[in-house]
Curated annotation (Swiss-Prot):
GO terms for molecular function: hydrolase activity. It comes from Arabidopsis thaliana (Mouse-ear cress). Residues 1-50 are annotated as: Disordered. Signal peptide: none annotated. Keywords: Hydrolase, Lipid degradation, Lipid metabolism, Plant defense. Specifically expressed in roots. Residues 124-338 form the PNPLA domain. The nitrogen atoms of the two glycine residues in the GGXR motif define the oxyanion hole, and stabilize the oxyanion that forms during the nucleophilic attack by the catalytic serine during substrate cleavage. Transmembrane segments: none annotated. PROSITE patterns: PNPLA. Residues 26-46 have a biased composition (Polar residues). A motif (GXGXXG) lies at residues 128-133. This is Patatin-like protein 8. The active site is at S168.
Length: 525
């Protein structure tokens, strides 16, 4: 997955060997038109991966079909269909069926109707967002609590029940924490440790009273526009040193191979001007793709204006990147995680489509500072637009991914895909620096908003219809999701063929023994 991440052009696709060509037939090969080869240009050492981005191509095909033809015409649009159940017919579901004639899952539908006989790959995605990561941390704590309750195992951890985790920014750090291991058997950190980590280190990472204002893409834009300067100041250097110290204390010399399951953590590589994904699957194949977890977390959290960029390299020194924050690359990494599952046939051989996935995406809240009306904004200049543009850029990109993924799931979007997101707050507008304010008052307010978020009704994305308020609260959705995770793990023990065949890392002791043996063999020759 160490690759440049691009949206495929929607017109035509032709394949030649292991490269995918996307061609725009409406214009000649001039700058700005498509006649390009999608390879893995991020790294000179990158291996050849599956060429076509299945989920993204289907998503953008849906978008094209909608705007050109209208999505209601089934002849012009692919939408995944659930298998017919007793009482259904080709003409449509029976009255008792949880599907409407348009293929939409009715609220409250038991997901047992949609459980794939092949099993489902369980995917966790965590957004970036600076101090707003406290909301995702609270969701993780509640999820782990529910897993313990549903499984009856007081030692249950999130890593026991998910097959893949992806994160950006602070979400990437959380993903690394809950999947990191020292003994190859149990995770080092509990879910509550993620929340504590952010609270305890916030004052060292962020400056009280800072006007920088945010984590993720929007926040970075805001800091650059407002300050007119980037890294290099004494305050940024001090914050960077504290971040590196905290990461070293948490992860020591653990690498991507020292994680229990596949993880994906994003950053933006300035040297190749492309998003970069650190992937455990790649690390297990070559040391050239194995990075230290402390360097990965440093890279994904390198928010411009708050922390310095970082030059990081693989454990063998052959692969390098100059990284800034993962939120600039993808503030919501859900689509990247799903695409990884579709492409990783070695570890997920049974996956055929979205019906074989069970995805939980944790947002960090849409916490608007203030609402605007037309009369207020119509005469704004660049200075007045700086803050709203930053917020729109950050939150808007994350929500677009949510909308696109929901469309990709079609009728399975209520049974196989859950997004947990704060839908505003009754506690009043947040301050302009909510994402970077480490003071106790801001931590207290974010904690209260997180508790309020769990009580709010879950908001679902609807096909080209904005949002829909669901019948279940976010806490009820998480509880339901935990039940599904436990059921999936129980069913795996009785299936004839494995749902997941995870590659195992070779221990350092075994690696040294293997290297010593190879050295002796070479000497004998």
């Amino acid at each position: 997955m160490n690759r440049r991440y691009e949206k495929p052009p929607p017109l035509s696709v032709s394949s030649k060997g292991k490269k995918k060509h996307f061609v725009n037939h409406t214009a000649p090969n001039t700058p700005g038109n498509y006649e390009r080869t999608q390879t893995s240009p991020t790294l000179s050492t990158a291996r050849s991966h599956e060429p076509d981005d299945k989920l993204n191509y289907e998503i953008f095909s849906i978008l094209e079909s909608k705007f050109l033809f209208g999505y209601e015409d089934p002849r012009l649009l692919w939408i995944p269909q659930s298998p017919l159940r007793p009482g259904d017919s080709e003409a449509g579901p029976s009255p008792r069926s949880p599907l409407t004639p348009n293929g939409v899952v009715l609220p409250g539908t038991p997901s047992s109707s949609f459980r794939s006989p092949r099993g489902r790959i369980c995917v966790l995605s965590i957004d970036g967002g600076g101090m707003r990561g406290l909301l995702a941390g609270k969701s993780l704590i509640y999820l782990e609590q529910m897993l313990k309750e549903k499984s009856g195992d007081p030692n249950a951890r999130i890593a026991d029940y998910f097959d893949v985790a992806a994160g950006s920014g602070v979400g990437g750090v959380f993903a690394a924490m809950i999947f990191a291991t020292r003994d190859g058997n149990r995770p080092i950190f509990k879910a509550e440790d993620t929340w504590k980590f952010l609270v305890e280190n916030a004052e060292g990472f962020y400056r009280s009273g800072s006007g920088s204002g945010g984590g993720g893409a929007g926040a970075a834009i805001k800091r650059v526009i407002r300050s007119g300067s980037g890294s290099g100041s004494s305050s940024v250097t001090a914050a960077t040193a504290k971040l590196e110290k905290a990461m070293k204390a948490s992860f020591a010399d653990l690498t991507l191979k020292d994680t229990l399951k596949p993880i994906l953590i994003s950053c933006y590589d300035l040297s190749s001007t492309a998003p970069f994904l650190f992937s455990r699957a790649d690390a297990l194949e070559s040391d050239s793709f194995d990075f230290r977890l402390r360097d990965i977390c440093r890279a994904t959290w390198a928010e411009p204006g708050t922390f310095d960029p970082v030059r990081t390299c693989s454990v063998d020194g052959k692969t390098r990147c100059v990284a800034v924050g993962g939120g600039l690359a993808m503030s919501n990494p859900t689509a990247a995680a799903i695409t990884h599952v579709f492409h990783n046939k070695q570890e997920f051989p049974a996956v055929k489509g979205v019906e074989d996935l069970l995805v939980l995406s944790l947002g960090t809240g849409q916490l608007f500072e203030v609402n605007y009306d037309y009369e207020q904004v119509k005469n704004w200049r660049v200075k007045e637009w700086a803050r709203p543009m930053a917020r729109i850029s950050g939150d808007g990109s994350a929500e677009f991914v949510d909308q696109a993924v929901a469309m990709g799931f079609g009728p399975y979007r209520s049974s196989n895909y859950v997004r947990i997101q704060a839908n505003g707050s009754r506690l009043g507008a947040c301050g302009p620096n909510v994402d970077t304010d480490p003071r106790a008052e801001n931590v207290k307010k974010l904690t209260e908003i997180a508790d309020e978020m769990l009580k709010q009704n879950n908001v679902e994305s609807v096909l080209f219809g904005s949002k829909r308020i669901g019948e279940m609260s976010n806490s009820e959705k998480i509880e339901w999701f935990a039940s599904e995770l436990v059921i999936e793990q129980q069913r795996r023990s009785v299936r004839a063929s494995p749902t997941v065949t995870l590659k195992q890392a070779v221990s350092k002791t075994n690696r040294n023994a293997i290297n010593a043996t190879l050295t002796l063999i070479s000497k004998d020759r």
